From Swiss-Prot:
This is Early growth response protein 1-A. Expressed in the presumptive mesoderm. In blastula embryos, expressed in the dorsal marginal zone, and at the onset of gastrulation expression is specific to the Spemann organizer. As gastrulation proceeds, expressed in a ring around the yolk plug. This expression is maintained in advanced gastrulae, with weak expression also extending into the dorsal midline. By the neurula stage, expression is excluded from the notochord. In late tailbud stages, expressed in two spots in the anterior forebrain, which are connected via a bridge of cells that also show expression. It is found in: Nucleus; Cytoplasm. The gene is egr1-a. Residues 139-169, 175-194, 286-309, 377-441 are annotated as: Disordered. A zinc finger (C2H2-type) spans 306-330, 336-358, 364-386. Binds to DNA motifs with the sequence 5'-GCG(T/G)GGGCG-3' via its C2H2-type zinc fingers. The first, most N-terminal zinc finger binds to the 3'-GCG motif, the middle zinc finger interacts with the central TGG motif, and the C-terminal zinc finger binds to the 5'-GCG motif. Binds double-stranded target DNA, irrespective of the cytosine methylation status. Has reduced affinity for target DNA where the cytosines have been oxidized to 5-hydroxymethylcytosine. Does not bind target DNA where the cytosines have been oxidized to 5-formylcytosine or 5-carboxylcytosine. Residues 381-391 have a biased composition (Basic residues). GO terms for biological process: circadian regulation of gene expression; positive regulation of DNA-templated transcription; positive regulation of transcription by RNA polymerase II; regulation of DNA-templated transcription; regulation of transcription by RNA polymerase II.
Length: 497
């Protein structure tokens, strides 16, 4: 229930029945407008002159007319219960005939009650009008302002003759107006909903609440977003622009940020200035160092011009790009991203070789077997396998060349066998012919026997043994005959034939 603070000057004339001019209706829309209860500038003297008795506080009708000169119809039309909107009533156009002969004017303000639960704030108008009706001469200087706790003093000062300001903290009033205070509307009505505006006679748009910012994160490269994710991106408010890649899809992000490169360049230049003069004399330009890429020895660390700026790291490099790549190890920066699987890399060559796993490209082929590889180091590692196989084949070929001289000595082993064989055959020959008769010696049989024996063995064994046996067994000329036979039927002549 709202408590009304009334500051009015009431005339001595009181009305016995103040509610006679009000239509008894349960809704707010049936109450007549407050300016219809006042005398207009043209009709004010007629009502005052007809109803004021003698001895009252008014001298004449002229004085009453002058008293309301400043109250015009335009001034009353600006007044409203909520300081912003007026209740439009088309059904009470003829209610002026029911107005009382005496009217009043005044200034009042309504303040909310702390322990009130009733939301029908127009009800205090009954108690206000029932006890305070009359005529009064009000000056703007004598009318006090509203209480300091009310924040609607600026709106009440817009209509000095008669104004009304209402401030309600209830969460769901029946008749609520859009607030015009400078602060945020969410502080006055924290749980306010726009439904009461739809049920009011004159709908007003709901107060502008601060829109909470969405926390939707757009990926770095939105080329591979799914359709539902692209729809979510459109929900982002206009003031929150997504990444620049959304505007121009063809533009790809830079591999290394320019700010990072400049920071490293300035830092390395400052580091060069702080190097001692002894080291400055030994500095070699990177361009001259690149003339000897295959030299066996590297540049000593103290002669490398680009040092790592991290205090705990003593690494130095001959090239600035090597230093930039090394600093990413400390910072953890991975500016190179795969556009297919969104994986990040710290080096561009790592990204290049990684993309080949998606595309299936294998540009490096083996020169020996023709096998293809996606990376050059994989081909190098594969080539070492072929080199090891060649070394194994070379090791197997050396024992075969050593075994060939052994086979050349095989005839010497067979030389030990011919000596006993001719002795076994020579003895029967000498014993079968003990007679000294030369004509009885069977030469054909002897000739047949010896060639068969001598053909299987070497010649030097045959010639040595039979000749000595024959000379020892016979002293007759038969020895010469046997020697001649052995010479004629020697294996040498047989081999030649």
């Amino acid at each position: 229930m709202a408590v009304a603070k009334t500051e009015m000057l009431v005339s001595p004339l009181q009305i016995s029945d103040p509610f006679s001019s009000f239509p008894h209706s349960p809704t707010m829309d049936n109450y007549p407008k407050l300016e219809e209860m006042m005398l207009l500038n043209a009709g004010g003297p007629q009502f005052l002159g007809a109803s004021v008795p003698d001895g009252s506080g008014f001298n004449s009708t002229v004085e009453g007319a002058e008293q309301f000169d400043h109250l015009t119809a335009d001034a009353f039309s600006e007044m409203s219960l909520s300081s912003e909107k007026a209740l439009v009533e088309s059904s009470y156009a003829n209610q002026t005939t029911r107005l009382p002969s005496l009217t009043y004017t005044g200034r009042f303000s309504l303040e909310p009650a702390t322990n009130s639960s009733n939301t029908l704030w127009p009800e205090p108008l009954f108690s206000l009008v029932s006890g305070l009706v009359g005529m009064a001469n009000i000056s703007p200087s004598s009318a006090p302002s509203s209480s300091p706790s009310s924040s609607s003093s600026s709106s009440s000062s817009q209509s000095p003759p008669l104004s009304c300001s209402v401030q309600s903290n209830d969460s769901s009033p029946i008749y609520s107006a859009a607030p015009t205070f400078p602060n945020s509307s969410s502080e006055i009505f924290p749980d306010h909903s726009p439904q009461p505006f739809q049920n009011a006679s004159i709908p007003y748009p709901p107060p502008a609440y601060p829109v909470s910012k969405t926390t939707f994160q757009v990926p770095m490269i939105p080329d591979y977003l799914f359709p539902q994710q692209q729809g979510d991106v459109s929900l982002v408010s206009a003031d929150q622009k997504p990444f620049q890649a959304m505007e121009s899809r063809t533009q790809q992000p830079s591999l290394t940020p320019l700010s990072t490169i400049k920071a490293y360049a300035t830092h390395t230049s400052q580091d060069l200035k702080t190097i001692n003069s002894t080291y400055q004399s030994q500095i070699i330009k990177p361009s001259r160092m690149r003339k000897y890429p295959n030299r066996p020895s590297k540049t000593p660390p103290h002669e490398r011009p680009y040092g790592c700026p991290v205090e705990s790291c003593d690494r130095r490099f001959s090239r600035s790009d090597e230093l930039t790549r090394h600093i990413r190890i400390h910072t953890g920066q991975k500016p190179f991203q795969c556009r297919i699987c969104m994986r990040n890399f710290s080096r561009s060559d790592h990204l290049t070789t990684h993309i080949r796993t998606h595309t299936g490209e294998k540009p490096f082929a083996c020169d020996i077997c023709g096998r293809k590889f996606a990376r050059s180091d994989e081909r190098k590692r594969h080539t070492k396998i072929h080199l090891r196989q060649k070394d194994k084949k070379a090791d197997k070929a050396t024992p075969v060349s050593v075994a060939s001289p052994v086979s050349s000595y095989s005839p010497s082993a067979s030389t030990s066998y011919p000596s006993p064989v001719p002795t076994s055959y020579s003895s029967p020959v000498s014993s079968s012919y003990p007679s000294p008769v030369h004509s009885s010696f069977p030469s054909p049989t002897t000739a047949v026997t010896y060639p068969s024996v001598t053909s299987t063995f070497q010649t030097h064994g045959i010639t040595s043994f039979p000749s000595s046996i024959m000379t020892n067994a016979f002293s007759s000329p038969m020895s010469s005959a046997l020697s001649d036979m052995s010479l004629t039927y020697s294996p040498r002549t047989i081999e030649i034939c």
